Curated annotation (Swiss-Prot):
GO terms for cellular component: extracellular space. Keywords: Disulfide bond, Extracellular matrix, Glycoprotein, Leucine-rich repeat, Proteoglycan, Repeat, Secreted, Signal. Its main location: secreted. LRR repeats lie at residues 83-103, 104-127, 128-151, 152-172, 173-196, 197-221, 222-242, 243-266, 267-290, 291-313, 314-343, 344-369. Homodimer. Forms a ternary complex with MFAP2 and ELN. Pfam families: LRR_8, LRRNT. This is Biglycan. Belongs to the small leucine-rich proteoglycan (SLRP) family. SLRP class I subfamily.
Length: 369
């Protein structure tokens, strides 16, 4: 019988999309569980699968770096003050945890022989230099977590087997064309917390990628980046400096289920902009500078959650959220947040929320000048 901690770790690594995981590994930022877990979204989940637990048989190898904990095919070397990747790592290792150390460089032979490595965790080190051949031996690597380091560029020659890349909280200012070439299996990139501006994305930077999830939060974006993958189901651009959403900004993202634009400076959403998102279910526009409810919400038949709190909205019309007359909405709202807006909620007509599942799903009040 496999130890519970190992099974839980493997399942978390293999199935979790890019939201907060707490416990043994701290890989991510600050969101909840992915919404893409129902029948219509099942196709958006990662296709990487779970590692074959039957293959994790004890090897009883004496190879274990000094100070590390090695069990089955998991090597944990976190929080040891390491200056470099340790030697004597068993070649059959599948999970290698090197987070919270002082590693500053990845050399050409650091991962030599680790052909079975599935997940590599390098979070919270001081890595600023990566040799172009450092990842060459990692033929089966699917998860690379290299957030909270000192990188100024996306690492070269990433393994073609890679499914998930977490590279947030570094110093990256540019995403050049071709940097992701050959990564046909990639479906998740987390690159928030880098000083990226719109001009930092070269045309064709994401060519060839079929991403389900992309987060570029806490950057320096002033608009929605152009030419992101059309396959996206989730796009998170929160905590930027975006000021407006223009008609063509969302034209190519018809497969979005969740769009995160909270904590920006958005004052204007051009009429018709949201009409290109027929499958949208969750829309985050909280903590912006909107003066009215965006037009087009009643036409989004699958929309269930809208965050509009902490804006400058002064009025809510009776047809701002729900279709008129016999208009069909396939999924009723289960969450509309309007609190911390100067809306006289006692003047809002009850029929405004005729397509909401429960009155408790509507959040008003708590506005302070």
């Amino acid at each position: 019988m496999w130890p519970l901690w190992l099974v839980a770790s493997l399942l978390a690594l293999s199935q979790a999309l890019p939201f907060e995981q707490k416990g043994f590994w701290d890989f991510t930022l600050d969101d909840g569980l992915p919404m893409l877990n129902d029948e219509e979204a099942s196709g958006a989940e990662t296709t990487s699968g779970v590692p074959d637990l039957d293959a994790l048989t004890p090897t009883y190898s004496a190879m274990c770096p000094f100070g590390c904990h090695c069990h089955l095919r998991v090597v944990q070397c976190s929080d040891l003050g390491l200056k470099a990747v340790p030697k004597e790592i068993s070649p059959d290792t599948m999970l290698l945890d090197l987070q919270n150390n002082d590693i500053s460089e990845l050399r050409a032979d650091d991962f030599k022989g680790l052909h079975h490595l599935y997940a590599l965790v390098l979070v919270n080190n001081k890595i600023s230099k990566i040799h172009e051949k450092a990842f060459s031996p990692l033929r089966k690597l699917q998860k690379l977590y290299i957030s909270k380091n000192h990188l100024v560029e996306i690492p070269p020659n990433l393994p073609s087997s890679l499914v998930e890349l977490r590279i947030h909280d570094n110093r990256i200012r540019k995403v050049p064309k071709g940097v992701f070439s050959g990564l046909r299996n990639m479906n998740c990139i987390e690159m928030g917390g880098n000083p990226l501006e719109n001009s930092g994305f070269e045309p064709g930077a994401f060519d060839g990628l079929k991403l389900n999830y992309l987060r570029i939060s806490e950057a320096k974006l002033t608009g929605i980046p152009k030419d992101l993958p059309e396959t996206l189901n989730e796009l998170h651009l929160d905590h930027n400096k975006i000021q407006a959403i223009e008609l063509e900004d969302l034209l190519r993202y018809s497969k979005l289920y969740r769009l995160g634009l909270g904590h920006n400076q958005i004052r204007m959403i051009e009429n018709g902009s949201l009409s290109f998102l027929p499958t949208l279910r969750e829309l985050h526009l909280d903590n912006n500078k909107l003066s009215r409810v965006p037009s087009g919400l009643p036409d989004l038949k699958l929309l269930q959650v809208v965050y509009l709190h902490t804006n400058n909205i002064t009025k809510v019309g009776v047809n701002d959220f729900c279709p008129v007359g016999f208009g069909v909405k396939r999924a009723y709202y289960n969450g509309i947040s309007l609190f911390n807006n100067p809306v006289p909620y006692w003047e809002v007509q009850p029929a405004t929320f005729r397509c909401v599942t429960d009155r408790l799903a509507i959040q008003f009040g708590n506005y302070k000048k």
